[in-house]
Amino acid sequence: YLFTIKSKRYCIVEKKIYSYDEAYEESLRYFQGDELAARVWVNKYAVKDSFGNIYEKSPEDMHWRIANEVARIEAKYPNALSSEELFGLFNHFKYIVPQGSPMTGIGNNYQVASLSNCFVIGVDGEADSYGAIFKVDEEQVQLMKRRGGVGHDLSHIRPKGSPVKNSALTSTGLVPFMERYSNSTREVAQDGRRGALMLSVSIKHPDSEAFIDAKMTEGKVTGANVSVKLTDAFMQAAIDGKPFVQQYPIDADEPLFKKEISATDLWKKIVHNAWKSAEPGVLFWDTILRESVPDCYADLGYRTVSTNPCGEIPLCPYDSCRLLAINLYSYVVNPFKPDAYFDFDLFKKHVALAQRIMDDIIDLELEKIERIMAKIDSDPENEDVKLSLIHISEPTRLQLIS
């Protein structure tokens, strides 16, 4: 039903529980018989609680849910869009398409789910200790279980054979930790959907060749995408057929470890492996840094370190991104006809609206964070205190003797 606030109309969908079959059949009609689309939507994007109760029967309900919430935020600002206007942009995925996390999380009070799609994490300071490595692992899992994709860089891990101050004496290098993070990703699943992970390393790292080869063994590092960060100096050395120096730490003026390699041979290996197994991806890192807005504020601590799992968005540690797509097909007028053309005017208008909606989604994300913090403040957990007794049998034994 509809209601009006300040001349803006809003649609409210009454909460009703649907069976899986009801939701599937209605979604099948919505997608005009596309069984895969209907099944994926019901399994992944329909609002449901932890008991499996389904509260939406088709993407139309989902689009009203998103439109209502975005319209609520819009009402805080001038020239607010109504829920009906927003629904017209979302319906049937015609123009503006919020991606997975916003589709699932906006207006969803049954699940703790972030509205951000992807995160990059990292550790400041001494980052190659086991404590730091486990901290990244824990943060990765906590984000993934709340529907976030994660990326992080491994260039801080000391190379294989480096001395360590424990019983092992030397480091195993970064490849075993690729397996650790990969396995953690595979362990986190939601309705058959596992986490998404990007692992990156600088070509300057002495273990970068082992990193590049890690996925050539079948069954290894299957829970992660891997990309190597290529520098201009490496690419120039590969073109010129000159040697390239790798070192650890990678940016140190006085590195602890250095080795010289053939840049051309390593470049050929990257190309071969990418041809054979579709990995590693390549990140032209100096170009990324030159174009990076955060790195303009490097003196304030901002630094781009890795990308989201799909590799299209470089991010700083503990930064996040929200994804939204625009369906270009819908802007083609008279498709597949001689007089077909692209409606640039409508496209320009919708690009501006899409960015505005993304700003609204940030407001919605902040609300979720505020609710989480309010719960923590109002419901603090009691701290456990443990008092142990040693020699517990001694008093009894001594009394018996006496």
Could you say what each language-model-derived stretch is?
Residues Y1-L389, S393, R397, S402:
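Extended catalytic cores of very large enzyme megasubunits
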